[in-house]
Amino acid sequence: MSCPVIELTQQLIRRPSLSPDDAGCQALMIERLRKIGFTIEHMDFGDTQNFWAWRGRGETLAFAGHTDVVPAGDVDRWINPPFEPTIRDGMLFGRGAADMKGSLAAMVVAAERFVAQHPHHRGRLAFLITSDEEASAKNGTVKVVEALMARNERLDYCLVGEPSSTEIVGDVVKNGRRGSLTCNLTIHGVQGHVAYPHLADNPVHRAAPFLNELVAIEWDRGNDFFPATSMQVANIQAGTGSNNVIPGELFVQFNFRFSTELTDEMIKERVHALLEKHQLRYTVDWWLSGQPFLTARGKLVDAVVNAIEHYNEIKPQLLTTGGTSDGRFIARMGAQVVELGPVNATIHKINECVNAADLQLLARMYQRIMEQLVA
C-alpha cells in the first residue's frame, strides 16, 4: 500500500522507542517538518527528548503527541515481530500503531498537505512532541509546558493525537479528562507474636473498619460532563510472610479519578478526617498526577466535530472518561484541548493494530481542522 501516512507510520514503528528512548522517531518527524518551513526547538530534559516546532505567527493550533511506546510483552505471541510493521487484511500491526505513531504520521502528513495548499496561512501551526508519556511523564510535556509558560508562549488550541475512538475513527472525542490523585498510606501498629496479641497492635485489624468505610463513600454524582468520582484500592501489603507474626505496618495505595465536582484538597481533607475518626496512627504521601480539565463547545471542538462529520458522516460523542493524558499539562496554558485519534481497542496489547484506512482518514480530518483554525 503506497500512502505517505502509512509509510511514515511504518518508519516510526520500526524504531523501538521504549519509553523514554525516542530511538530516532523525532529526528524523522523533524526532518519532514523542517522541509516545510517549521522552526525546531529541541527541549530535552534528563533522559527525555522533546521538541517544540512552529510555523507562522498569531493564533496558535498545536498538535501534541508522544513517540514512546510501552514494552511489547511476549514477542512470540505476536503474529509478526512488534517492531516490524506489517499489513494484514487492511490492518497495520506493530507496537505503537494505534498509540500513537499512526497519529503522529497523520499529523505530519496533514501539515505537509496544509502548508502546500496554504503557504501563507494566517495563524501559527505548532507541534509539541515528547518521548516520555507512557512511563513517568516527568521530563516530557509537563516540562515543555512549564518552559513555554515561563516565556509567555501563546497556545490557543491543542489537538492531542491519543487513540480516542472506540469502534470507528472519530466516534469518540475526548474534550476533557478526570483528575488523578493517588494516596500512599501506611498504618502503623506494633509487631508481635500471633499467640500474644495483647503484646502487639495489628494494623490490619485497626485499618479494616477505615477501609470498609472508605470504599463505601459516594464522593459525588458527577455532572453533565464528568462521570462520578471513583476510588479504587490498587495495592495492599502487610506481614512478613510468616504465619506466626503480627505485622507492624500495613501499606495501602488507592487512587481517585475525580470530576470537577471535587478538588484534590477536598478529597485529602475527607480521607484525613476518616483516619482521625478511626484513631489510626499513620503516615501518608499524596501524588497528584493531574487536575481535571474540560474544553467546552467552542472553536476547537466545533472544528473537530465538523471534520469528523465531513469525512466519516457521524456525530462524535464528547467524553471525559478513561485515563489521564498529556492534555492535562497543556490545559494549564489556558488552551482549548481536545483528543482525537484512532481506535483504541488494541492499545498496549499483544498484536496492537490499527485500520490503515483509518490513518488516511485521520490525516484528512487533521488537515481540515488546520484549515478551519489557522488557514
Swiss-Prot record:
Location of the active site: D68, E133 (proton acceptor)
UniProt keyword list: Amino-acid biosynthesis, Cobalt, Diaminopimelate biosynthesis, Dipeptidase, Hydrolase, Lysine biosynthesis, Manganese, Metal-binding, Metalloprotease, Protease, Zinc
Regulation: Mn(2+)-activated peptidase is inhibited by Mn(2+) at concentration above 1 mM and by increasing concnentrations of Co(2+). There is a competitive inhibitor effect between the substrates. Hydrolysis of Asp-Leu by Mn(2+)-activated DapE is inhibited by SDAP, and hydrolysis of SDAP by Co(2+)-activated DapE is inhibited by Asp-Ser.
Enzyme Commission number, as recorded: 3.5.1.18
GO MF terms held by the record: cobalt ion binding; dipeptidase activity; metallopeptidase activity; succinyl-diaminopimelate desuccinylase activity; zinc ion binding
Keyword presence, Amino-acid biosynthesis: yes
Cellular component aspect of the GO annotation: cytosol
Positions of Zn(2+) 2 binding: D99, E134, H348
Binding site for Zn(2+) 1: H66, D99, E162
Note on how the cofactor is bound: Binds 2 divalent cations per subunit, one with high affinity and the other with lower affinity. Zn(2+) and/or Co(2+) ions are used for desuccinylase activity. The form of DapE active as a peptidase contains Zn(2+) in the high-affinity site and Mn(2+) in the low-affinity site.
Pathway(s) where this gene product acts: Amino-acid biosynthesis; L-lysine biosynthesis via DAP pathway; LL-2,6-diaminopimelate from (S)-tetrahydrodipicolinate (succinylase route): step 3/3
Cofactor(s) annotated in UniProt: Zn(2+); Co(2+); Mn(2+)
GO biological process, one term: proteolysis
Keyword Transmembrane: no
PROSITE patterns: ARGE_DAPE_CPG2_1 (PS00758), ARGE_DAPE_CPG2_2 (PS00759)
Highest rank taxon of the organism: Bacteria
Catalysed reaction, written as an equation: N-succinyl-(2S,6S)-2,6-diaminopimelate + H2O = (2S,6S)-2,6-diaminopimelate + succinate
Protein family according to the UniProt entry: Belongs to the peptidase M20A family. DapE subfamily.
Additional free-text comment from the UniProt record: Zn(+2) is usually found in the tight binding site, but the nature of the second cation in the low affinity binding site is different according the activity.
Quaternary state and interactors: Homodimer.
Function as written in the Swiss-Prot or TrEMBL entry: Catalyzes the hydrolysis of N-succinyl-L,L-diaminopimelic acid (SDAP), forming succinate and LL-2,6-diaminopimelate (DAP), an intermediate involved in the bacterial biosynthesis of lysine and meso-diaminopimelic acid, an essential component of bacterial cell walls. Can also hydrolyze all N-terminal Asp dipeptides except Asp-Pro. Asp-Ser is the best substrate, followed by Asp-Gly, Asp-Leu, and Asp-Cys.
Protein name from the UniProt record: Succinyl-diaminopimelate desuccinylase
